[in-house]
Amino acid sequence: MLDKSQLSADIAKSNQDAEIAKFDALAQEWRDPNGKFKHVLAFNSTRLMAIENAIAVHFQRDLNQDIPFQGLNILDIGCGVGLLCEPLASQGADVTGIDASGHNITLAQRHAQKWSIKVDYKHCLAQDLIGNEPQYDVVLNTEVIEHVDDQQLLVDTCCRLLKPSGLLVMATLNRTLKSYIVGIIGAEYIMKYLPKGTHDWNYFVKPQEITSMIAPHGLETITVEGMSFNPLTGQWKITDKPDVNYLLYALKTTD
């Protein structure tokens, strides 16, 4: 006699295995330097290097050490598939990555498990962490604010989650004519690096606006770095011109 419960269990397990395999493949695809996300990976590589250097300078750490960020608690808000979380965790930091997309968190978790990298991934919003009042040495908010309606709330939350003397890193796009031409017309319509409609120029944020938003929380902007893309080489570099993509670093001076 056919055991329908066993059959259902076998089908469920088969479906689950297929889903796991799909997520594993997607997680790996996100890290293929020659795959469809190669432009994102090139951008992330330069951004990561800049962030690592900023953390090392701020906390007086030597990047030549095996685990230079040991003892630091880092929060990545809008972590995506963990492109920043994993390398920072591999350098000794205790990393928490949160994202509003459960799909992203699943991909990140699968990849971290595969390579035995310890990251605490959570499917939640930044505001969801406020009740427990955890505080972090470093709070990262990269390429998120330009997609958020209540930008002030997001910045307020970032500041509240940061320890005194901690480092806030905000990465986004400046609201300039050049950013419209390069970041939207060029990236989305001409070069097609991003899907059309990825960005709304009206949501881009000027560095001085972030500086004003963080000031009531006792944060001061330390420096602002620009990021520039060379379409001929496909490479990004750090510049002193934050007129399109930029990174803003801020110090929390008070409780």
Where are these regions (language model features)?
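Conserved class I S-adenosyl-L-methionine
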Residues: 169-191
